[in-house]
Amino acid sequence: MKKQLILCLFLLSLLMISTFVTNADDNDNEIYEEEEDFTTNRDVKQRGLVRENVSAKQIINNYNKYFKNVDIKNFEQGNTLVYITPWNGKGYDVATKWAKKFTHISPVWHQVKFENNKVMIEGDHNIDKKWMEKVKENSDQKSKILPRFSFEGQQWGSKESFQKYIDPKLIDSLVSTVKKNNYDGLVIEGIVHINKQLRDPFLISLSEKLHSIGKEIILVIYPFRQKGQETGFGAKDFELLSNHIDGVSLMTYDFGPSGGMNAPKVWVEDNLKFLLPNGENKNSKKIFMGIPFYGYKIGENDQSDAIVGSEFISVLKQNKSKKLKFDQNTHEHIFTYKNKKNQQVSMTYPSLLFIEDRIQLANKYKVSISIWEIGQGLDYFMDLL
């Protein structure tokens, strides 16, 4: 009886060992440690998943499995800003679970509008105090919550309108909203294109008032699509304002969705060079280089449609035998398949290598990163951050 028991225990141990991860370099059917909570003992790099040669089956087998220590921060060169949208609840969950990886978290909550001859700050209904408390708790009070305030409407588009509506009262209202809700600051979008003679004093005054109460301000800026294109914000603007504000969020995505290009690596790098013509400087870290966690589907109905992680995985599951192609020019993975109407469709969606390539760019230029938006990605992306 004792020998039978020992034999049973030996066979059981062999069965457990057989579930361990094998090298993924040449094996699309990677065996992984399957646990109920989807955690693994090795991150995506250790599992050999950050590579050009990727199949649908490999992604399906691994996308929801992440390294068990969610507190380890792998991108340490700069800060990490992540956006969250109210209409995508997954982002809130990601922000709380991996809170220690994110230095700045920006929920898209507020709008600044002009109605009935007065400026209004809207969005209080989006505020989630319990979630804010959870983020603070999980990050040991280190993650900063800076909701986005988007200036919306045509009146912000002209010098005359901006001059009329921007006054100390608006600055006081913005500061009051930040203070009242115990935010760590704000991300401001929608004014970068305004006349600099009005924009810059406004931003400097706002930043001074926020800094006086220990709060931060980050400005959203747009990339150029072609060299020489006017963006409203260049190297001289960054040199001036970076001495006053806490950062600029550079939206290096949506380069050419209709052509299947979301954020070509060379284009992202060109935008960094545009802001840093002399290379890195003391304020380089204040540039939050944008990395998209969404992609595009091209070919259906002759248009391009944005896709998020769940949609990407759904398509892969219907086309398990296919492989992705890595474009050496854009450094993006492309997946091509035929839909139910027999139309050829192409998808470009971030891969692990796509993200790693852009993180290495951030390391090269000593800048920070920003992600739009965290809920649209796949869980194993977090291993790289």
Curated annotation (Swiss-Prot):
Identify the domain of life.
Eukaryota
Q: Which SMART domains match?
A: Glyco_18
Q: Tell me where in or outside the cell this protein is found.
A: Secreted
Q: From which residue to which does the signal peptide run?
A: 1-24
- InterPro entries, from UniProt? Chitinase_II/V-like_cat, Chitinase_insertion_sf, Glyco_hydro18_cat, Glycoside_hydrolase_SF
Domain (GH18) spans: 78-385
Q: Which PANTHER family match?
A: CHITINASE DOMAIN-CONTAINING PROTEIN 1, CHITINASE DOMAIN-CONTAINING PROTEIN 1 FAMILY MEMBER
The protein's name in its UniProt record: Chitinase domain-containing protein 1
Q: Which organism is it from?
A: Dictyostelium discoideum (Social amoeba)
